[in-house]
Amino acid sequence: MTSMASLFSFTSPAVKRLLGWKQGDEEEKWAEKAVDALVKKLKKKKGAMEELEKALSSPGQPSKCVTIPRSLDGRLQVSHRKGLPHVIYCRVWRWPDLQSHHELKPLDICEFPFGSKQKEVCINPYHYKRVESPVLPPVLVPRHSEFNPQHSLLVQFRNLSHNEPHMPHNATFPDSFQQPNSTPFSISPNSPYPPSPASSTYPSSPASSGPSSPFQLPADTPPPAYMPPDDQMGQDNSQSMDTSNTMIPQIMPNISTRDVQPVAYEEPKHWCSIVYYELNNRVGEAFHASSTSVLVDGFTDPSNNKNRFCLGLLSNVNRNSTIENTRRHIGKGVHLYYVGGEVYAECLSDSSIFVQSRNCNYHHGFHPTTVCKIPSGCSLKIFNNQEFAQLLAQSVNHGFEAVYELTKMCTIRMSFVKGWGAEYHRQDVTSTPCWIEIHLHGPLQWLDKVLTQMGSPLNPISSVS
């Protein structure tokens, strides 16, 4: 009690009352400063303090929006850290382990949600809900493969992979993503698989740092470069979280449950591993991500933070001047989030990052090997578990090789500073000075279990073509 008393000795009664509803016991001083800053803003608005106290004291009861003015870059500075206001106060009063704005979705009753770009933003923590990971339906593996595969979207997507161009295509975010995309392959009218949601692109999201992130970045992180249209953000979120309409009945209408073996998805201990390369040389050990929010940067971190993969620590005797110069420009690097069954890459570096993700390319209707440029301050969804689950559910009916082909979708390559592909003089990722390879463990382990259940391929996979 003595320590608590000394903590609140110079705290106003209003701040004391609001801190009474604080969740968790970490960062007491920071929470006090965050609440104090909020009280100063709310005192200027009649009834705002009362409405906030009502919401905090009666969580199950309806409450009104509690708003503060939106800053120029949408963020709020508390102490030496910047973050998005709704994330800060949801973290104080509801979820102390909240990592990112990607984990929050506004309720329908909220009139001033953060994503609506209005002059005021609602910070009522009970006007937001936490995005939950969708429950993926098990893949039903036929015990006896008598399925006659038709020309479906999956087959045509795979055929494109087999006829890969000498150099990958390039796309720049958000420019290449804003025009209505036409799928580069035609869809058979009899295909049981739906078209990729190419027109439903996921827009950039504001750079989040400070309280909404465990990394305590300085206050001068890049401001958001692009904000999504209101309806676009809402549509994408609601679509990606809808698990009610699974693909099983459509894919296997005439197969009884006795003829199939269900294989369920399980979350692994480490959701991904990251390997760092310089040109075609692997450097250092693989980083295994246990936290759902990981920073890969160019600095050194003597504290061995499990949420950070610091490339500045890694040495390579074969390093040339181009690599050295590129490493100096990695800076704050990339922030990887795994939220609600989706993986996002957020560019915190002053230089762009370049991503090759077959899952992302499928979603946007790009060629499978397309390399997407993500400028500083932008973030892009680079993997969606639900879309992968749908592709896997269909591919089991096309045989072992079709499922095995999906392993390529579970590896994402990302280059710092320097791009590669048709628009760059570097043709391959192994020609870029500094790049990482991200292996998604959950999807890979799911594939492994499905392949084990399927048995041997009809045409054994070998190195001989």
From Swiss-Prot:
GO terms for molecular function: DNA-binding transcription factor activity, RNA polymerase II-specific; I-SMAD binding; metal ion binding; RNA polymerase II cis-regulatory region sequence-specific DNA binding. Pfam families: MH1 (PF03165), MH2 (PF03166). Its main location: cytoplasm. Residues 198-214 have a biased composition (Low complexity). Keywords: Cytoplasm, DNA-binding, Metal-binding, Nucleus, Transcription, Transcription regulation, Zinc. It comes from the Eukaryota. Residues 271-465 form the MH2 domain. One of its GO terms (cellular component) is cytoplasm. Residues 173-183 have a biased composition (Polar residues). Zn(2+) binds at residues 65, 110, 122, 127. Residues 13-137 form the MH1 domain. Transmembrane segments: none annotated. It is found in: Cytoplasm; Nucleus. Residues 163-242 are annotated as: Disordered. InterPro entries: Dwarfin (IPR013790), MAD_homology1_Dwarfin-type (IPR003619), MAD_homology_MH1 (IPR013019), SMAD-like_dom_sf (IPR017855), SMAD_dom_Dwarfin-type (IPR001132), SMAD_FHA_dom_sf (IPR008984), SMAD_MH1_sf (IPR036578). GO terms for biological process: anatomical structure morphogenesis; BMP signaling pathway; cell differentiation; regulation of transcription by RNA polymerase II; SMAD protein signal transduction; transforming growth factor beta receptor signaling pathway. Transcriptional modulator activated by BMP (bone morphogenetic proteins) type 1 receptor kinase. SMAD5 is a receptor-regulated SMAD (R-SMAD). May form trimers with the co-SMAD SMAD4. Belongs to the dwarfin/SMAD family. This is Mothers against decapentaplegic homolog 5. The gene is SMAD5.
